[in-house]
A protein has these predicted regions:
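Membrane-interface interhelical loops and short amphipathic "cap" helices
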Residues: 1-20, 47-54, 78-100, 152-188, ...
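N-terminal signal-anchor module of multipass membrane proteins
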Residues: 2-45, 53-57, 62-69
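Membrane-interfacial loop-to-helix junctions in multi-pass inner-membrane proteins
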Residues: 46-64, 90-96, 100, 120-138, ...
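Hydrophobic alpha-helical membrane-insertion segments
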Residues: 63-71, 134-154, 230-241, 356, ...
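Membrane-interface helix-loop-helix modules in multi-pass inner-membrane proteins
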Residues: 65-135, 152, 461-463
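Internal alpha-helical transmembrane segments
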Residues: 115-123, 128-134, 145-154, 174, ...
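Aromatic-rich transmembrane-lumenal/periplasmic boundary elements in polytopic membrane proteins
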Residues: 150, 232-348
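C-terminal substrate/ligand-recognition segments
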Residues: 389-456, 487-511
Length: 524
């Protein structure tokens, strides 16, 4: 058991490492791709050589980021087979479909048109080149769609049926998987956060060049485009985040409770805006969960259910199976103890089904199919030793959520301010306080990355211990490998990905420092 725990923890750590490194490149690809396409559209409309130079500058940075992002993403898909082979077998028919479409359709689409985008200047018509640029940007979004649909299915399994004869889940509705509320909100929330990062990146880099008194006209134009895309992105990110909260409240109430550090729910539940958790607080005790808190009255009920008087269950309520309607009447839900018992019944029925199949007992198989279907939705709970095993890391989820919301709120104010200054203060670089604004813009780049990664920490840590919500826990999904193997590959990936990140930053900084946009004006 100890070795299993070590393997699970190290495999989770390895996947978190590679996923976070990969995510450092993905949102910039999503956001910068759209910005470059818009800039080239302006160039084609105006025929201005200055817009051409500006387009090529940002396109160069896009290409550097895209190349490193592809390199970091390849390893992720292989990890499902090496470290999580039971999961791959259990849901491969479903989970593999969107990933296969992403690889065959979206990635090849990006790879084909990015070649035209970079090497087609002067070789294809301007309109065809613009089309290639837009298709590259759209291809990146389509690529994200399939990956995010797969991730959403892990958190809210729909559109499938379990086949006890093959011990695998089989797809019955592809559209249900792709169009589930969880998938739709996750896609738009993630892509719009990429637009936000792309906009902030353009504004921040432009402000760095303004600090150096270089390429002033180009930077001021870039700031306008970046600020518009960033503002649209952050507003839509917040809007889709609201929808995501509702789906989480419905399908993953334990995650919502962990996000709030909420142990005992109430009708008209307050939302903790700022708070410090009590590290001594345990499930079932009477200690105050917070050392300090500033709350918004009824905010969590509004966020979770769009109803200020609705009941939001806490961790103790969810474990005990307690809930209440808006009029205060108790609503029966299934306690975690009962879920564990039903999970064991499903597990036992599966074993008996396998034995009946070997003996050719079709009558027993028919009866066992009914039992399996009755309890299958709780199969994952069979692997839990106690109900508390289903509680995610509360401090990490709680604080990550507040980091995400806090920085996101700052970015909204910053981008709106940037838009105002870009149009009302056309000679922004000459203002006496401009240096402070430029430095704030530069600092906003890493802050946006922290915000983005924090969102993924909430999404992934908050759903633990499930790799497939309620159906399969991490311990059930793990491959039969040694902890030493995972530790070795973890160290290799850590060194490799760190080297790639350093290379990416170094190349980008070198290009930003040395590239004079005027030198690109006459480039064809």
């Amino acid at each position: 058991m100890e070795n299993l725990i070590n393997v699970v923890d190290w495999s989770r750590a390895q996947f978190a490492l590679t996923a976070i490194y990969h995510w450092l490149f993905v949102p910039l690809t999503l956001g910068l791709g759209i910005i470059v396409a818009i800039m080239e559209s302006i160039y084609l409309h105006t025929k201005s050589e200055r817009w051409l130079a500006t387009t090529k500058f940002w396109m160069l940075l896009f290409g550097i980021n895209f190349a490193i992002g592809v390199a970091t993403g390849i390893i992720l898909e292989f990890e499902f087979g090496t470290n999580w082979s039971n999961y791959s077998w259990f849901v491969g028919d479903i989970f593999g479909a969107p990933l296969a479409i992403e690889g065959i359709l979206a990635f090849f689409m990006e790879s084909t048109f990015i070649a035209v985008m970079f090497f087609g200047w002067g070789k294809v018509s301007p309109k065809f080149h613009l089309t290639a640029t837009w298709l590259t940007a759209i291809g990146a979004c389509i690529s994200a769609l399939w990956i995010l649909a797969a991730n959403a299915w892990m958190q809210c399994p729909v559109g499938m049926e379990f086949n006890p004869e093959t011990m695998r889940n089989e797809m019955v509705s592809f559209s249900a998987i792709v169009t589930s509320p969880m998938a739709v909100y996750k896609f738009f929330h993630t892509v719009m956060s990429g637009w936000t990062l792309g906009g902030i990146f353009v504004v921040g880099v432009s402000c760095w060049m303004l600090l150096k008194r270089r390429n002033i006209e180009h930077c001021l134009r870039s700031i306008k485009v970046g600020a518009w895309i960033g503002t649209i992105g952050i507003v839509l990110t917040m809007a889709t985040g609201d929808g995501s909260a509702v789906t989480v409240a419905e399908h993953q109430p334990m995650k919502l409770a962990a996000m709030e550090g909420l142990y005992d729910g109430n009708s008209g539940q307050d939302l903790v805006a700022i708070g410090v958790l009590n590290p001594e607080k345990k499930v079932g005790d009477n200690l105050d969960p917070y050392i300090f808190e500033i709350s918004l009255p009824k905010g969590l009920s509004i966020l979770a259910n769009h109803d200020k008087d609705s009941f939001v269950p806490g961790i103790n309520d969810i474990i005990a199976g307690r809930s209440f309607s808006t009029d205060g009447k108790p609503v029966n839900t299934i306690s975690y103890s009962e879920r564990m018992e039903r999970g064991r019944k499903a597990q036992s029925a599966l074993r008996q089904f396998g034995e009946a199949k070997r003996q050719g007992d079709t009558l027993a198989m028919s009866q066992l199919r009914i039992d399996i279907k009755k309890h299958f939705n709780f199969l994952g709970y069979a692997s839990l030793q106690s109900p508390s095993d289903a509680i995610p890391n509360i401090p990490l989820t709680f604080y990550s959520f507040r980091v995400m919301v806090g920085i996101g709120s700052f970015l909204l104010v910053f981008l709106l301010t940037t838009l105002f200054l870009a149009y009302k203060r056309p000679e922004l670089e000459k203002s006496k306080w401009s240096k402070w604004f430029f430095r704030l813009a530069i600092i906003s780049i890493p802050l946006t990355y922290i915000c983005s990664v924090s969102g993924w920490v909430v999404a992934e840590v908050g759903r633990q211990p499930w790799i497939n919500q309620d159906l399969m826990s991490n311990s059930m999904a793990i491959s039969d490998i040694s902890a030493g193997y995972v530790q070795t590959t973890f160290c290799i990936f850590a060194v490799l990905f760190t080297a790639l990140l350093i290379a990416d930053i170094s190349i980008m900084v070198k290009q930003i420092r040395k590239k004079s946009l005027e030198n690109l004006n006459s480039t064809k």
